[in-house]
Every structure is written in structure tokens, then in C-alpha cells.
Amino acid sequence: MGSSGLVAAMADVVARGIDISSHQGEIDFAKVRAAGYSYVIIKAGQGLREFQTFRGKYLPAVLAAGLDWGAYWWSDAVTVDEARREAEVFVAALGKLRPTYPVYMDQEYASPCGQWGLNQGKQTRTDIAAAFLQTLEQAGYYAGLYASKDWLEHWVNADKLKNYDKWVAQYAAKCTYGGAYGMWQHHGDVPGFVGRCPGISVPVDLNDCYRDYPAIIKANGLNGWGAQEPSGEMVPRGEYESMKAERDALQTKYDGLVADIQAVISKYRG
């Protein structure tokens, strides 16, 4: 069963969370949770590439902190076939993981299809989104579309995507999108609308959620929750620490290699 038919009218805020990518750097998720945020939406990849920070860095730490989570995938697709292939890579990246929040397609102005311009290729963009989301849904996931308010109003035919929950980006005092949506991304009420969250040293997007996604997903057997409930942490703390140490060692080697290359370049330029 997919997300079709589960889209409901917006209600009161039921949970607050954040969404993250590698731009957020190191995060203390215990502090995030203590500040009242209960879920994290993690950038899992882009185009046909999974990001190492998804399963190798952020997800183990999110689980260790006891936070709910979902994931999103930046789409570079300009054809329906490309969209399906991207979604298949996303599904492969999710593997046997069981997110408690939806998994989202991310359509952006900076993407290839976004660069076509306003009202150019609107139907194709809609078809691309539908193909991506249908692929996720057919794989058993609660699929949703992340996009800005303007994108949903002008760059795709949102009515053709009404069976999928919307995660609306609008950096304002309130969300004024007229359609149904399950989550609103904003920057909070600090000066400049730059989101801040304890445990994160750089700006981060904040999110208000209007649906009890963990309950909906589990009740409908989506995202792998059709079988028995997990008995504990998917990634034990010890394994997480081992993964973190390995990642840090690789990063050190990478930084050293970059420094050596820069030294050689400087030598020959000098």
C-alpha cells in the first residue's frame, strides 16, 4: 500500500523537526532532541548517487538519539525514465531500513528541469515527479514531494500530484500554500529567518509537521513496517562508533591527499 488515499487536510502541528545535509556538518542529535525536535529528514542522495553522509554518518547518530526519521532525494531528472531510475537508486539506498517519516522527491529551481524556466515544460516536470513518486510508492514507501510554494503553484500541476503529500518550503512567518500539505519548511522566527537549532553550529531548516506520520506509516504497513517491529536500534552504538572512526580516518587521508595535490600545483605554478 502506498501513500495514495492517506492525504488529509492540514491540522494543528503535531511534531517539529529539522532537515539536514552535509552542509550541517557535525551534529549533536541528543541536543536536537532535548530542544523539542522529534524527527530528522536526511538528504540521502542526488541524481544517481547516494551520499555517504546518509547511512555512513547521520542515520546511525539519529537512531542512537532515538529520533524519528525520513529521507529526501534531490532529483536531476529531465525525463520520466530518468526519474524512475533515480527513484530506484533511492530505494536501493534505503535497503531494509524502516523510516518512520515519508521519503521525498526534491524538485528544485537549480535542477536541470528547473532551469527550463517558468511555464516551460510544466507538464513534463509533473510527469517526472509522478514517475519518481510512483516508483517509491510501488516499492512500499510513503512517498511525498518536497518543493517550494512557488514551484507547487506554478512549475508543476500540483492537482495531478494530489495523491502525494507535499512538504512545502516557504521562508515566512506562516505557510500560505493553498493546497493540502503535511509538512512546512521554514527558518523559524529569529532575525532574518535563519533557522537555528541546539546541537548544530550552522543554520538549519526547521519543519512543522501536521500529521502523525509514524502512526500512519506503521498502521498502513508502509516503509517496511509490514513485518514485526524492530527490537531495538538498527545500528548498535558500538557499531556506530566504529563507523565514525573509520569515516574520520578516511577523511584525514583525503585531506592529506588534497593538501599534497595543492602543494604540487603551487610548485609548478610558482
For every predicted segment, state its role.
Residues 136-154:
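Aromatic-lined carbohydrate-recognition surfaces of secreted/lumenal glycan-active proteins
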Residues 110, 150-153, 171-176, 188-191, ...:
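Short Gly/Pro-enriched loop/turn and capping motifs at secondary-structure junctions
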Residues 2, 10-133, 137-140:
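Substrate-binding cleft of extracellular glycoside hydrolase catalytic domains
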Residues 73, 147, 170:
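Short beta-strand/turn micro-motifs composed of small residues
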Residues 2-24, 30-31, 157-233, 238:
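Functionally critical loop-and-helix segments that line ligand-binding/catalytic clefts
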Residues 232, 236-239, 243-246, 250-253, ...:
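Heptad-repeat coiled-coil/leucine-zipper oligomerization helices
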Residues 69, 142-144, 166:
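Hydrophobic anchor at the start of a short beta-strand
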Residues 82-85, 151-161:
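Glycine-rich, charge-decorated loop segments at or immediately adjacent to ligand/cofactor-binding or catalytic sites
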